[in-house]
């Protein structure tokens, strides 16, 4: 479109039946496309802007430049020069923001309360009109990118992604390192290079904007024209061509790789390369993603799992800048599977060969097509920020009228196209990767950026071998999955029996000695869906002297039962009926969600199967031993995930009783005797003496809910009437002593990990309702400043954030930092310094700023639940905590409206400053250990409130030196065992 052409409006857009909003697409004179969505009911507005340029545009000597642009773009504009302006405006008005860079696109997005949306959108638009790329921020953001790279360096998914890129044609942009690091971005003229790239490639005609707001469409159109008309359209712009050289060649294909992963896992990854398919309405590769990833009867997953060769099989497909596509199959192997990995490879390729020999199954295609249509028509409402982010990308990929449907629906059955793509599943365009720690002596090659060790050879596999592969044809069938009996047939919305009296909150509809059930018929979301959750507390099973053993037993039992039911569970899930169960040492959670047409019959079938499963030595010994091995691997791998995630888990275990840590569980599995008979005995006793509670909610009638409760009680033989005399244990929160800095520190076993993490916890205690609101205001005030200080200004690590942690009604403020540049004790001091510096800001907060934070929290408290799931989960929390404050959001809003600046300052003085209760959880990498240990011997002199330091390396020692809080919730299913 030339700059003299009139703007265009597109009004005919395919929507879901459940979409209540209005929308249009506006194309501005400068070529920018804007999808505008008007939803009068939303309390939160959002905008996302995508630029059809990403890391593929980086030149080989400035890798990471597009990602660097994404970071630095937010650092001030000509109109709003302060680098903090955008972040501070969002923070004061309850907003959030982020961005991401892909190979061929970069997406920026935010959300905020409605009343502040125009101001935020103005600030946002300026990034694409007149950014400053603040010179003082350059080195800081290079450090931030390097921290991000360091954070990802020991995560297998990042390492594998880069290895697969590096094996492509080195002349192709698809082979490049995209994140960037200090080495690739450390040019003296990096800012000038960035400006050159921005001024050349950030042009309006390759930008897409998506807005979701309560504003009417005419208002949105005028606003977008006003704010985005000056986004420059670059003269002589030419879209980069990524297919000048072929991305893969003979050297890139038909290879077999052995790779040493970070985690102790054995995996096989199959990757096929395909030409890009422009016909997105036929979606051939998406069709085969569904088929080859299916876990129901007749499938390859069913065969491999029943033979105890794998624990997981997943499929995915990805289009790469409309140049080529890849199709991946990921398999996690058992020990047996790894020992026989060639048989696993041949079995999978044999399954594909059998499917190739058959006619494309139109029945299965139509089943997938119809199910996708039903899911789309009755989709749950998403948060505005998630919706704009997704559809901003979709606007780049699909016709404007198909922006919502292009990615989701199968519209066209094209047998010839499907057959053509099926025939391309061949050895010649396939790479196979085998991952194992056992390849230490075989992998002599090293990937440049992440240091991944691997070996490479041509795939030693012939079609004849696959053809000769034999499987027990009396026991197994290789074919398309059978027809799905769980597919919903009745999508009727049940009317409320008393429309004049709409019930807003769950009501107690079943009240027996040992069973309580709450029910709420939906009158808000109007979708043919329901959610059911049942928690069963065990009494007979609880043995205080063997909690660790019982936790292990319950985990293994859950895994074996799930494996037994895997095919039927997957068939249900394919029809959007999701059955989940978790077995703990003291309780069992059962849930079923999805289209209500199948909930009652589905739950009955699942529970009957669980009850009737007979574990026996002959049938289950092999799977028991394999699951035990898998659990040992899982526990060991826990310590190899992102450092801050390990620290967070330990924080939770330190601050409450009754949680077994991974180290103790691992030691028990390695050193103590555990047999299948232990699981059999546990299962036989599980339902002998129980206490249960239900929540049933959604498009269901009360009579149906009562039928479900009674049927379930009969199937599981729950004793709903007999009084329980035996008391059992309840979790309690740990009460930290005042003016002590507790430190729990432990060493990361991975010698290659360069990052340490610290979780710095300030315990506030049990708070009154009014105090809880001041706690939320304090978090709202400090959260963006914490990020700005420790992440942006001090560049201590890519992960630097605050969080709120409610542990059994005891409230905490939590600071989280993961860093490769400084040890945890140094960062602990910087966090103490942060609180010290912000004390003056808290005491001197202006009335205007205070009111902005309060108003944003009131809007959030009054915000309607976005979907049934959000509402259900909140109600479930109230039931399990036995608070029953189903109107908690309204209550919070009432208390917030009474909050004053003076009350806020008083809260800080009395609850925080005079009541300093602090715990640091430090997960220390090996390069930081000695320095960190030395600092732990020094006194804390930078905090007046801290008088003493106590250091621990055992959870039991830490908990033994502190008292416990009383049980604050009203729940008394379990009395404290004295």
Where are these regions (language model features)?
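Enzymes that process phosphate groups on RNA ends and nucleotide/triphosphate substrates
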Residues: 145, 422, 760
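Active-site glycine-rich loop that binds ribose-phosphate moieties when present
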Residues: 188-194, 674-678
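His/Glu-rich zincin catalytic helix
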Residues: 2-85, 122-125, 182-185, 195-307, ...
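M16 family metallopeptidases and their MPP-like homologs
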Residues: 37, 42-68, 82-127, 158-184, ...
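Short, conserved secondary-structure transition motifs
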Residues: 146-152, 241-262, 363-389, 393, ...
């Amino acid at each position: 479109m030339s700059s003299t052409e009139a703007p265009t409006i597109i009004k005919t857009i395919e929507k879901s039946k459940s979409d209540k909003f209005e929308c249009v697409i506006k194309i501005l004179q400068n070529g920018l496309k804007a999808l505008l969505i008007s939803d009068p009911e939303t309390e939160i507005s959002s905008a996302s802007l995508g630029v059809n340029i990403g890391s593929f545009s980086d030149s080989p000597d400035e890798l990471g430049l597009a990602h660097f642009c994404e970071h630095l773009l937010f650092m001030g504009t000509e109109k709003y020069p302060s680098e903090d302006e955008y972040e501070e405006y969002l923070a004061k008005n309850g907003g959030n923001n982020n961005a991401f860079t892909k190979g061929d696109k970069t997406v920026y997005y935010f959300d905020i309360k409605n009343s502040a949306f125009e101001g935020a959108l103005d600030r946002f638009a300026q990034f694409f009109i007149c950014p400053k790329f603040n010179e003082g921020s350059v080195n800081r953001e290079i450090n931030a990118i390097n921290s991000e790279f360091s954070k990802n360096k020991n995560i297998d998914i990042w390492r594998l992604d880069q290895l697969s890129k590096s094996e492509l044609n080195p002349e192709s942009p698809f082979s490049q390192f995209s994140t960037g690091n200090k080495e690739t971005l450390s040019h003296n003229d990096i800012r000038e290079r960035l400006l050159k790239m921005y001024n050349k490639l950030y042009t309006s005609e390759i930008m897409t904007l998506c807005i979701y707001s309560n504003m009417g469409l005419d208002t949105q159109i005028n606003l977008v024209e006003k704010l985005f008309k000056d986004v420059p359209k670059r003269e002589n712009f030419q879209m980069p061509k990524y297919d000048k050289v072929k991305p893969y060649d003979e050297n890139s294909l038909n290879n077999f790789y052995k790779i040493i992963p970070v985690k102790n896992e054995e995996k096989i990854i199959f990757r096929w390369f395909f030409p890009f398919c422009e016909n997105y309405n036929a979606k051939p590769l998406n069709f085969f993603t569904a088929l080859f990833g299916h876990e129901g009867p007749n499938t390859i997953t069913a065969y491999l799992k029943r033979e105890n060769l794998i624990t997981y099989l997943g499929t995915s497909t990805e289009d790469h800048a409309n140049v080529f596509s890849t199709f991946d199959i990921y398999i996690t192997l058992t020990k047996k599977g790894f020992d026989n990995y060639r048989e696993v490879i041949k079995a999978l390729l044999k399954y594909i060969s059998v499917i190739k020999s058959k006619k494309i199954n139109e029945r299965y295609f139509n089943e997938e097509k119809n199910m996708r249509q039903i899911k789309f028509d009755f989709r749950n409402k998403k948060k505005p920020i998630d919706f704009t982010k997704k559809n901003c990308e979709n606007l780049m990929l699909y016709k404007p009228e198909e922006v919502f449907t292009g990615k989701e629906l199968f519209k066209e059955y094209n047998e010839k196209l499907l057959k053509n793509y099926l025939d391309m599943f061949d050895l010649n365009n396939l790479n196979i990767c085998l991952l194992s720690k056992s390849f230490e002596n075989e992998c002599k090659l090293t990937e440049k950026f992440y240091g991944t060790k691997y070996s490479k050879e041509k795939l030693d596999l012939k079609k004849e071998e696959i053809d000769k592969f034999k499987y027990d044809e009396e026991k197994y069938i290789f074919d398309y999955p059978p027809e799905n009996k769980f597919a919903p047939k009745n999508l009727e919305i049940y009317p409320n029996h008393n429309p004049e009296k709409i019930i807003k909150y769950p009501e107690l509809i079943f009240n027996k000695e040992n069973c309580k059930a709450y029910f709420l018929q939906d009158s808000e979301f109007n979708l043919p869906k329901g959610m059911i959750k049942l928690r069963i507390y065990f009494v007979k099973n609880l043995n205080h002297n063997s909690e660790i053993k019982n936790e292990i037993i319950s985990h293994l039992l859950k895994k074996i039962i799930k494996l037994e039911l895997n095919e039927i569970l997957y068939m249900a899930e394919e029809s959007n009926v999701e059955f989940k169960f978790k077995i703990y040492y003291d309780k069992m959670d059962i849930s079923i969600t999805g289209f209500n047409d199948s909930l009652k019959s589905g739950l009955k079938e699942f529970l009957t199967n669980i009850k009737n499963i007979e574990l026996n030595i002959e049938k289950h010994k092999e799977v028991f031993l394999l699951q035990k091995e898998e659990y040992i691997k899982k526990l060991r791998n826990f310590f190899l995930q992102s450092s801050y995630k390990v620290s967070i888990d330990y924080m939770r275990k330190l601050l409450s009783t009754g949680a077994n840590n991974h180290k103790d569980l691992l030691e028990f599995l390695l050193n103590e005797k555990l047999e299948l008979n232990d699981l059999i005995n546990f299962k036989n006793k599980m339902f002998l003496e129980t206490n249960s509670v239900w929540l049933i909610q959604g498009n269901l009638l009360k009579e149906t809910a009562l039928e479900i409760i009674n049927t379930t009680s009969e199937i599981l033989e729950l004793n709903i009437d007999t009084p329980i005399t035996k008391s059992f244990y309840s979790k309690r929160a740990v009460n930290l002593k005042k003016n002590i800095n507790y430190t729990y520190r432990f060493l990361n076993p991975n010698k290659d990990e360069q990052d340490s993490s610290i979780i710095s916890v300030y315990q506030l205690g049990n708070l009154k309702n009014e105090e809880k609101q001041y706690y939320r205001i304090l978090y709202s005030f400090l959260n963006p400043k914490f990020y700005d200080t420790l992440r942006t200004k001090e560049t201590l690590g890519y992960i630097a954030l605050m969080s709120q942690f409610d542990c059994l009604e005891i409230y905490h403020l939590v600071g989280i930092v993961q860093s490769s540049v400084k040890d945890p004790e140094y960062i602990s001091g910087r966090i103490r310094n942060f609180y010290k510096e912000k004390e003056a800001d808290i005491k001197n907060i202006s009335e205007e700023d205070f009111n902005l934070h309060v108003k944003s929290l009131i809007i959030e408290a009054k915000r309607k639940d976005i979907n049934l799931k959000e509402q259900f989960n909140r109600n479930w929390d109230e039931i399990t905590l036995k608070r029953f404050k189903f109107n908690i959001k309204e209550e919070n809003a009432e208390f917030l409206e009474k909050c004053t600046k003076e009350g806020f300052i008083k809260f800080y003085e009395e609850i925080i400053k005079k009541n300093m209760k602090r715990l640091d959880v430090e997960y220390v990498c090996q390069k930081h250990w000695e320095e960190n240990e030395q600092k732990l011997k020094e006194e804390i002199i930078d905090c007046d409130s801290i008088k003493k330091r106590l250091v621990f390396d055992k959870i039991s020692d830490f908990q033994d030196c502190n008292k416990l809080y009383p049980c604050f919730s009203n729940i008394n299913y379990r009395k404290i065992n004295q």
